[in-house]
Amino acid sequence: MTLVMVLANNDQAIILADRRTSQQREIMLPDGRTSLARHPVDEEYNKLTSFVCADARVGVGFTGVATTPTGFNTAKWLLTALMEAARPSPYLQPTVERLREIATRDIGALPGEHRLTVVLAGYLHSDAPPLGCLYWISNFEGLGAKRYGPVRPAFESYVITQDRPSPEPFYLMQVYGSIGALKNRASQEDGAAVRHLLAQRRPAHAIRDKALAALSRAGAPSGGLGGIGRQCGSIVVPSEPSEPITTGYLSDENRWQVEFPNQVVMVGADTDGATMGTYFRAEDPTEAPPLAVRKVPRNHACPCGSGIKYKRCHGRVLPPIRS
């Protein structure tokens, strides 16, 4: 199960997710007993989408069922579900409520029992200045990280919005899905560091990169057992509507193809629609440097093999990729 992380303050909302899908299978222990463990199926399955509607911009992520043996694909379903939900009225609040109804209808119709949480984090622009908001719909996760035992037949919707007026600075951190991967001392220290960056309103790339590093540290290497992996994606939604939504990708290995989050625009115009599967690719990996590499200390040699220090090669802070 995916780990989805939401980080927001007055400046931006950041949503992160690892890209692994996995299956629970039986393994043999050294003492001859058997146990169940999560085996990776796909290390590069995108679970993030940017969503723009008439009154809001949000990043969207999901955790839970990704695919089924019958051919259901949650990433594809989410695009069509968001468009169906927003079509009658392209505003965030009614869209989320209709998305809850669609999820109850469609996920409930799948054979078997399937957990799913869909998270939407960003800003409502009907307020001035824009209002930070976090919505999620789920059939197994509630408020305060509460989890229900059996999967519920109907999805529930939840919302957290920025308090106004408030003397306290606004920031929030929330995680969904494989939260057990963060129940260790290193992850708790990482969480405290990220919380400090949020409260101090540090640049978006500093907050995102620290959180991505923490998520990667908690994940298993490619092919290793575990519910989450080290290949991760990110969406950054600025609170200022004139600033572009940006996307990112963190890899634990050299990659010559990089896929970016999906996009849905539903503002009540003829141009409404969705895109999926956008990627950059080197046509000939034998002739081109990798597009993404494992992050290393700034003064170490870059893993791409260029012989240049990481900070002057793939570790340079470049202009963001715009969504």
Ranges and model annotations:
Residues M1-A288:
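N-terminal nucleophile
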Residues M276-S323:
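Acidic/negatively charged segments and metal-coordination signatures
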